[in-house]
């Protein structure tokens, strides 16, 4: 996998801070020591660890915003320990939240419970959250200039990007899907209420959790017929906690609480510092094995009324007589009302629309991922990226909530170690 610094794209520059109070470009102190962009699990974790380390961190974004767009009724695949953000044990863990709130939470964790938990973490650890969105980010001589969605401009010495995977939807190319209307083709990420497909015939393309769970939820909410089309010859069915129960006391030894990766690999990917020392070929192999498309047992048992076709892919799709006609790679066709793409996400940080051309030109990348160094810092000094974009440099754990334990701490240690107590001007809401 080659690394590169692609030429600048079509992003608009945020510009300078325009003489705002504390304008670093004008020679004064920046408004903020650290700006965290994003208020999901990774953003909240980074901010919490920074504040615990004595570093001022100002967080922008909608609390748990991406999670609030996910399908109602969804459940998290991760085990209880791995569903904690910030830390697996401590005052902000899922267990502590359940004890303090009285919430009855068990595996698999309901999406609604997880959103409530994340909102509690935000209220507890980042009560001063700034819900304005960052629309532009550019370099200045002393750090960064941020443009907000209300037109305000602020400056920051460092920036942590924790914006998740929303812009990274994977849409298969070469199938003619781009010209079809949204009422015919959509991604699983586009739907909060899958009851909207009641009475309709739907084909789902994909072989992982999102494809199968979306199929189950649609059928349970009244879809007339649902079929899942899986390109690979078989489906990877996860066996739940059966294996851990069978191996007894060995379970905690070979399976890390982060719950990422299969037997033995789990303990390796739990240690990003160790993982990144492996040869690139080994990293890629282990990462692919750890995040391969698979379906949880708790979803599998709900698929009794779902048609599943394996070893078949999509060749093309066209509207005909008010329906959508799918041409499949085995020569057969399907006539449906809607095609849903459960095709996951492909990281490409150039799709973060707020990054300006200057940053993109300087940002070293590998297959769409930023190439990160210690403290999850990019090749742009002072710019850090956490969450899924960190997976190429620090392993697959960063794609998951449990990766926030590592990333938040690593960013905080690096920034706190460089902090000299320099003054900042503050920011007005």
What are these regions (language model features)?
Residues 68-101, 255-276:
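Flavin (FAD/FMN) cofactor-binding and adjacent substrate-gating region
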């Amino acid at each position: 996998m080659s690394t590169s610094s692609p030429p600048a794209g079509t992003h608009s520059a945020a510009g300078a801070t325009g003489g705002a109070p504390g304008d670093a470009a004008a020679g004064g102190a920046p408004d903020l020591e650290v700006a965290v962009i994003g208020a999901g699990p990774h953003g909240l974790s980074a901010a919490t660890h920074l504040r615990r380390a004595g570093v001022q961190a100002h967080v922008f974004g909608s609390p748990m915003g991406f999670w609030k767009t996910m399908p109602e009724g969804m459940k998290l695949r991760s085990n209880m320990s791995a569903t904690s953000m910030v830390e697996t044990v401590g005052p902000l863990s899922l267990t502590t939240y359940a004890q303090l709130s009285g919430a009855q939470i068990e595996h698999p964790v309901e999406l609604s419970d997880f959103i409530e938990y994340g909102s509690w973490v935000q209220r507890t650890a980042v009560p001063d959250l700034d819900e304005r969105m960052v629309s532009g980010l550019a370099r200045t001589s002393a750090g960064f200039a941020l443009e907000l969605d209300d037109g305000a401009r602020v400056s920051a010495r460092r920036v942590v990007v924790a914006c998740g995977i929303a812009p990274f939807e994977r849409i298969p190319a070469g199938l003619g899907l781009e010209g079809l209307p949204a009422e015919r083709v959509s991604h699983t990420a586009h739907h909060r209420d899958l009851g909207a497909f009641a009475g309709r015939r739907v084909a789902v393309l994909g072989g992982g959790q999102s494809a199968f769970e979306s199929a189950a939820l649609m059928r349970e909410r009244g879809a007339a017929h649902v079929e899942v089309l899986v390109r690979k010859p078989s489906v990877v069915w996860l066996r739940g906690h059966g294996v851990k129960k069978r191996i007894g006391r060995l379970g905690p030894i070979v399976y890390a609480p982060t719950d990422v990766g299969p037997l033995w690999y789990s303990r390796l990917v739990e240690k990003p510092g160790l993982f990144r020392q492996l040869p690139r070929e080994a990293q890629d192999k282990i990462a692919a094995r750890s995040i391969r498309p698979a379906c949880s047992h708790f979803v599998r048992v709900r698929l009794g009324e779902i048609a599943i076709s394996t070893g078949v892919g999509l060749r093309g799709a066209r509207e005909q007589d008010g329906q959508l006609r799918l041409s499949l790679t085995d020569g057969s066709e399907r006539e449906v009302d809607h095609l849903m793409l459960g095709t996951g996400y492909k990281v490409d940080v150039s799709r973060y629309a707020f990054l300006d051309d200057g940053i993109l030109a300087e940002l070293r990348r590998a297959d769409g991922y930023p190439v990160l160094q210690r403290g999850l810092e990019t090749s742009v000094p002072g710019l850090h990226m956490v969450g899924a974009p960190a997976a190429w440099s620090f392993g697959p754990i960063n794609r998951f909530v449990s990766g926030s334990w590592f990333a938040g701490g690593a960013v905080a240690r690096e920034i706190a170690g460089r902090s000299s107590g320099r003054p900042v001007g503050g920011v007005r809401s």
